[in-house]
Amino acid sequence: MNLLDTLQRGLADLDAQGLRRVRRTADSACDAHMTVNGREIVGFASNDYLGLAAHPKLVAAFAEGAQRYGSGSGGSHLLGGHSRAHAKLEDELAGFAGGFSDAPRALYFSTGYMANLAAVTALAGKDATIFSDALNHASLIDGTRLSRATVQVYPHADTATLGALLEACTSQTKLIVTDTVFSMDGDIAPLAELLALAERHGAWLVVDDAHGFGVLGPQGRGALAAAALRSPHLVYVGTLGKAAGVAGAFVVAHETVIEWLIQRARSYIFTTAAPPAVAHAVSASLKVIAGDEGDARRAHLAALIERTRALLRRTRWQPVDSHTAVQPLVIGSNEATLAAMRALDAHGLWVPAIRPPTVPAGTSRLRISLSAAHSFDDLARLETALLRASEEAA
């Protein structure tokens, strides 16, 4: 059997299991109301939590950045591609998200995946031990694999088991890595307990705040600020393509850690820098996030979250206890989840079906992503369609 035959059989297996993914094509800007595949829909699929992806100030800043710096960076950060826009943004990010450190410095990456790979692989070598939450994002998992370190996976948010594993560990370098807001459940890691364990056992805590940055904490400064945590043993990864509404990611840590990443993080060194216009737009986004408008958007999002939590409890399915913009509704089988997704789609609602391997088998779910761009009328429309789909599935 040749490779094409093998791949075709694999695709057929995915079809049979209800696991093949299908892309939809957006014909308009990311917003609550969009044109997708030629249809007008209300989208509950994006991670645009503050509704900034089409914000006029960010769009104008993007255009201004392109006029000033051009359309591309022209090279990697270490070989000619590092612009004044990148440098300015890194200084701003260190000040905005680095309150946990006495000497914070930031490093900008093109994607969150690359930032997580860098943070894990550059800090943990083959003689280290990494302790990873069982529900961590794939990018953290891939980072642990590429690091060649010993990896201990602890049950989700189980600090007792983690403590026992740390107690038994003899490695000189120990890293605890965790999402802050877990992307498919919406719950928040016990960060204060994790940091206490890290400091007790001489470990470092690496947190991926992809779904918390811009939303959690005072002025949206993130999960560490929300928990009022400070320590020199923290490494913070934030994403700029979700609540910030643009693209890219960053790592904030003690200045020595960041200098090490510049010298040794392969996902930073061996890739072309993001266009400076992107960094220029992120700088504009930070001003919105930290200002009165950002506060108003977070307050509206919080009200939407509470309304949605009440709605999900009225269905026949199993909501996850989430107080974040990620509101999952566990249905179970792939087939039933796809049927519910199609029922919502028939009402002009885009709510994605999340299936294995993204979530464990038997826990396929609808993942409702809320945005400050949504209105209560949008939620009322979701309520009508979701309750009808729930009744029809009974």
Curated annotation (Swiss-Prot):
Biological process, per Gene Ontology: biotin biosynthetic process
Name listed for the protein in its UniProt record: 8-amino-7-oxononanoate synthase
Pathway: Cofactor biosynthesis; biotin biosynthesis
Gene: bioF
SUPFAM superfamilies in alphabetical order: PLP-dependent transferases
Reactions catalysed according to its record: 6-carboxyhexanoyl-[ACP] + L-alanine + H(+) = (8S)-8-amino-7-oxononanoate + holo-[ACP] + CO2
Keywords tagged on the record: Biotin biosynthesis, Pyridoxal phosphate, Transferase
Sites of N6-(pyridoxal phosphate)lysine modification: 242
Function: Catalyzes the decarboxylative condensation of pimeloyl-[acyl-carrier protein] and L-alanine to produce 8-amino-7-oxononanoate (AON), [acyl-carrier protein], and carbon dioxide.
Highest taxon of source: Bacteria
Binding site for substrate: 21, 137, 358
EC code(s) of this entry: 2.3.1.47
HAMAP family: BioF_aminotrans_2
Binding site residues for pyridoxal 5'-phosphate: 112-113, 183, 211, 239
PANTHER family the record matches: 8-AMINO-7-OXONONANOATE SYNTHASE, CLASS II AMINOTRANSFERASE/8-AMINO-7-OXONONANOATE SYNTHASE
UniProt subunit comment: Homodimer.
